[in-house]
Regions:
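Conserved PDZ fold ligand-binding element
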Residues: 86-87, 285-316
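Serine-dependent protease modules
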Residues: 2-270, 276-279, 297, 316-320, ...
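Short, solvent-exposed beta-edge and connector elements
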Residues: 65-67, 273, 286-292
């Protein structure tokens, strides 16, 4: 017969036997594997440079007229400089009236927008902190990446701060569309898990150096599906100093306005049609012509750009990509189609908005 002390025990339970005690821990190997140690070291060093970004919009209640802060979204970023510059995606802070940055030590700081480049989905913020509080992210390169290299992503997916995922470089030289519908070239594809909230965070190589800014995913559900994209660090390292200095990307250009690609396609023209030439600009000084009205009241098309420095251009995106390969003050040869005649014209590039 069961005693009162046994009342309530599951049938057959024996709390005094070995089965009723915590199991002993199986001894581990003396050391972690080399790959594990490397991953841990990289994470512990790099995570200090990763930040959480939350933005809000200011709205006024139509009935009470009270002003409210409404959460807009969140994402990731990383410390660029000891002066408090933070790099993230433009789409992370788009439409924000107020931006808050949380550092790895949990301290919160209001941030101001220093500069943005929607065409490359990049933005630079700045926070005010005391000296020695910030650890800038180590910078690597993307031109020498190889498919199969190990990569690490650190960010705040779904608000879960300082989450680490790992994978490999799945492909190189991809193209994606930015918010402004411009094509971003040379994008790094990875299978490291990228989820909502990872945007703006760093993609690192096995040495813990920045090789890209996590930006987009391809997924039917909107969550991780094994295909993520990062803006290459070589692009980031070229653009961010411009954003810090000028607040925007200062591009070399021809000083022209262009006819939309759709119209050129409709007219069966392969190239970029000049709509208007800025007076005194590079194209004007080189003798390029925009669309103009004839004495009979008819519209005569402007010159058609077909190549820049030997690189063929068939769309406005092509032209802008060709411009990005040059600097302000460069001398380039532009090939145009004027009527039925092809001409090569030397042009000196100048800064344009």
């Amino acid at each position: 017969m069961a005693s009162a002390a046994d009342w309530g025990k599951p049938l057959g339970a024996n709390h005094d036997g070995p089965e009723g005690r915590p199991r002993s821990v199986t001894p581990a190997s003396p050391e972690l594997g080399a790959d594990e140690r490397t991953t841990i070291t990289v994470f512990e060093r790099a995570t200090k440079s990763v930040v959480f970004i939350a933005n809000t919009a200011i709205q006024q209640d139509i009935w009470s007229l009270n002003v409210m802060e409404v959460p807009q979204g969140s994402g990731s970023g990383f410390i660029w400089s000891k002066q408090g510059h933070i790099v993230t995606n433009f789409h992370v802070i788009y439409g924000a009236d107020a931006i808050k940055v949380t550092l790895a030590d949990r301290s919160e700081h209001q941030a101001k927008l220093v500069g943005a480049d929607p065409d490359h989905d990049l933005a630079v913020l700045q926070i005010q902190v005391s000296d020695g509080q910030l650890d800038p992210m180590a910078i690597g390169s993307s031109h020498d990446l190889r498919v199969g290299q190990k990569v690490l992503a650190i960010g705040n997916p779904f608000g879960l701060d300082h989450t680490l995922t790992t994978g490999v470089v799945s492909a190189l030289g991809r193209t994606i569309k930015s918010m402004s519908n411009r094509t971003i070239e040379g994008v790094v594809q990875t299978d490291a898990a990228i989820n909502p909230g990872n945007s703006g965070g760093p993609l690192l190589d096995s040495a813990g150096r920045l090789i890209g800014v996590n930006t987009q995913i391809v997924s039917p559900s909107g969550a991780y599906a094994g295909i993520g994209f990062a803006v290459p660090v070589d692009t980031v390292n070229r653009i961010v100093p411009e954003l810090i200095k000028h607040g925007k990307l200062i591009r070399p250009g021809l000083g022209v306005s262009l006819v939309p690609d759709a119209m050129a396609k409709r007219w069966g023209i392969k190239g970029v049609i000049i709509g208007k030439v800025t007076r005194g600009g590079p194209a004007d000084r080189a003798g390029l012509k925009g669309a103009r009205e004839t004495m009979l009241g008819q519209i005569q098309l402007g010159d058609v750009l077909v190549s820049v420095a030997g690189k063929a251009v068939t769309t406005i995106d092509d032209l802008m990509d060709a411009m990005e390969e040059h600097k302000i003050g460069d001398h380039v040869t532009v090939e145009i189609l004027r009527g039925n005649r092809r001409e090569k014209v030397p042009v000196t590039l100048q800064a344009v908005n």
